Amino acid sequence: MNDNIIIPKYKDSPYKKIPNELLNEYTMNGKIPIFDWFLDGRDNLHKKVWDQEYINSFLSKYSIENIISGNEGTSPYGHKICKNLLTSFIDYDIKNKNVAVVGTTSPWIEAMLLNLKNNVTTIEYNVPDSKVDNLQCKDYFNYFKNNKETYDAIVTFSSIEHSGLGRYGDPLNPNGDIEIMETIYNNLLKDGLLIWGAP
């Protein structure tokens, strides 16, 4: 990591091509190949307003009983991931806690945590509008990066590896994944728990 590089906020993200001044940082000085594959995930949020009816549909689908019995239906990453996450939440006693979920397009993880009586804060670049009492949604840059609160647990699945790539409208930053991990660490209580996963 080059501490001397100044990373401007690229407001036109996502980019179809890596800007020349960031190319060496993204490719580790040419060691990593570049593939021409453009994705625009700024509108990937399945629903922009999370009202009680919408959240209730997830609470019902992702109930503890449904996940344990394999009846949660089609899940974003399949039954095994849902069951592994739920098992982690139960084994590490993530119940009645203050929990953040970093990165989401639909509240499937939030539903599991809400079913375990947690207060949940979703952290997103593209922030949904929550109308549910024990589910807040906050902006990564305006809230989480400068947050003074700490969480008992933070959960993230298939999110951190995208940080800094600009796909979701976030600024380009070759060290985005490292920086968000530092931000997560700074938002955890001293004995807090991070549950991290990637497909």
Predicted segment positions?
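Residues that mark the start of a beta-strand
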Residues: 97-98, 150
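A short hydrophobic/small-residue beta-strand
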Residues: 120, 194-195
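A short glycine-rich, Lys/Arg-flanked "PGG" loop and its adjoining helix->strand segment in the class I
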Residues: 172-193
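Surface-exposed cleft-lining segments at the edges of enzyme active sites
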Residues: 66-73, 162-175
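A short acidic, Gly/Pro-enriched loop at the edge of an enzyme's catalytic core
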Residues: 143-158
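Class I SAM-dependent methyltransferase SAM/SAH-binding core
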Residues: 100-145
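Short strand-turn motif at the edge of the Rossmann-like AdoMet-binding core
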Residues: 197-199
